[in-house]
Amino acid sequence: MSLQIDAVILAGGMARRMGGDDKGLVELNGKAMIEHTIERIKPQVKEILINANRNQTRYAEFGFTVLSDEHTGFLGPLAGTITAMGHTQADYLLVVPCDCPLLPRDLVARLLAAIEANDAELAVASDGEREQPVVMLLKPSLRESMTAFLEAGERKIDFWYAKHRFAVAAFADQPNAFVNVNTPEQKQRLAAEINQS
């Protein structure tokens, strides 16, 4: 029996470093940032959910279900992940940010292989040097644990997954896969890179 894997694209943040612009909707090479992310992950998953706390109507135009955080107050990636976990029946949920337009085309396969090889509950991506806490594959059954962690006042996703059996999938062969956009300067650099990928 093949596993069902859904994805959530996290676009629920405040984007303070981008001058408050909604990062998923910032244009990059003629497309909204989130469109690049969708193109990368769509062939790898069954359903895509978008977590957004503003501009929901605009995000809905991409043709996917848009979910706002159940926990209000812009509480970060944990809140968006918890919300998505409550809206999927899949075996695993892929979590990615909206501003990583160069995500690996084999992201799911390698995260899943890491889970299976280590009998883990979730796998986190690494660029070969640093873990990427908001790029992970996890079981939706972990929702209760994540909710309790958030409601205890915690926000850091890596502190949460450290409490579980987690594996790391290294993508040292794709060092730019997780480059994201936090400043207009990074956006310019990334635009050039996308043209070459």
From Swiss-Prot:
GO terms for cellular component: cytoplasm. Its cofactor is Mg(2+). InterPro entries: MobA-like_NTP_Trfase, Molybde_CF_guanTrfase, Nucleotide-diphossugar_trans. One of its GO terms (biological process) is bis(molybdopterin guanine dinucleotide)molybdenum biosynthetic process. Signal peptide: none annotated. It is found in: Cytoplasm. Its main location: cytoplasm. It is an enzyme of class 2 (transferase). It comes from the Bacteria. GTP binds at L10, A11, G12, K23, N51, D69, D99. Disulfide bonds: none annotated. Mg(2+) binds at D99. Keywords: Cytoplasm, GTP-binding, Magnesium, Metal-binding, Molybdenum cofactor biosynthesis, Nucleotide-binding, Transferase. Transmembrane segments: none annotated. It catalyses: Mo-molybdopterin + GTP + H(+) = Mo-molybdopterin guanine dinucleotide + diphosphate. GO terms for molecular function: GTP binding; metal ion binding; molybdenum cofactor guanylyltransferase activity. Its EC number is 2.7.7.77. The N-terminal domain determines nucleotide recognition and specific binding, while the C-terminal domain determines the specific binding to the target protein. Monomer. Belongs to the MobA family. Transfers a GMP moiety from GTP to Mo-molybdopterin (Mo-MPT) cofactor (Moco or molybdenum cofactor) to form Mo-molybdopterin guanine dinucleotide (Mo-MGD) cofactor. This is Molybdenum cofactor guanylyltransferase. It comes from Shewanella sp. (strain ANA-3). The gene is mobA.
